[in-house]
Amino acid sequence: MLICGENTNPLARYTLMAQGEQIHISSYPPVWPTRPASQAGGYDLEQAIRIRAGAHSFEAKVFNVVASACLDKAMLDRIADVLGRAVLADIEQAPRGVSVVIGPTGLPVSEVVSGEEKILYCDIDLAECVEPKQFHDVVGYYNRFDVFRLEVDRSSNRPVTFLAPPYREYGKEADRRPMTAADQARELETEGFHLIDA
């Protein structure tokens, strides 16, 4: 599953393809007004969704379940109350997101829903992903693994890493290695603090 603009990221999409996804889920907001309705060149959310969803389905040979949120009357009334009628007018005139299921050929295999809250039903057959992969399997035979490689780091990212002071001696030479919890405890104790287990 990728959210909104993440579906534009080819590395994220390829990572999912390489893990063998057969059904991709794309979620989008109900509307994305990037300019006032009076200005040309605004972002066409509906068209962008159709292009991205179709491209991913075709490249990955997967079904893509696209789910866009919906703005109901209560939300529109609240926007008008908080942000004003001018902002509401821009939102009402902006292209809406769409909900649809796209098949492995890149074409819709369900009805297209836009601007209303509705449950979308669609029967899919995963066997339909097989033949298209015989033509272009970009995570298999139809790739140049001798030239291209994608590396994904699944390690957890720490919110903070404490580094030792730059000239502190650890062994034979000065080292700016990350401080372990034990290093931090020793440093606190040398400064007169004592750690107590709770």
Model-derived features with residue positions:
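CN hydrolase (nitrilase-like) catalytic-core segments centered on the catalytic cysteine
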Residues: 4-120, 192, 196-197
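Cysteine/selenocysteine-centered motifs that mediate thiol-based redox chemistry or coordinate metal-sulfur cofactors
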Residues: 69, 129-198
